[in-house]
Amino acid sequence: MEPTKDETHAIVEFVDVLLRDGAVIQADVIVTVADIPLLGISLRAAIAGMTTMTAYGMFENWDATHRQRSMTGGRTIPVPNEKNGK
């Protein structure tokens, strides 16, 4: 029997799934000394590709602003005001 090498790499598959589907990580940590709570940490993170983030309504304004800047060479074009049209 000859040894074989698996052609798929687990880390590449993991990153593909993470960017495509995303992940939400939530953690609450309380640091105590002698049963006295000293520090509380609440963490919530969403990790995904920008396509997935904007599909779920996250970073929509940021994405639109940066796309506009890249299309205009770094210049920001003011959006007309609805009241006065300027």
From Swiss-Prot:
Subcellular compartments: Gas vesicle
Transmembrane residue ranges: none
Induction and repression of expression: Transcribed from early-log phase, decreases as cells enter stationary phase, probably as a long gvpF-gvpM RNA. Highly expressed in 25% salt, poorly expressed in 15% salt, no gas vesicles are formed at 15% salt.
Keyword Repeat among record annotations: no
InterPro entries per UniProt: Gas-vesicle_GvpA-like (IPR000638), GvpA (IPR050530), GvpA-like_CS (IPR018493)
Keyword terms: Gas vesicle
Database matches in Pfam families: Gas_vesicle
Family statement drawn from the similarity comment of this UniProt entry: Belongs to the gas vesicle GvpA family.
UniProt-recorded name of the protein: Gas vesicle protein M
Organism: Haloferax mediterranei (strain ATCC 33500 / DSM 1411 / JCM 8866 / NBRC 14739 / NCIMB 2177 / R-4)
Lineage: Archaea, Methanobacteriati, Methanobacteriota, Stenosarchaea group, Halobacteria
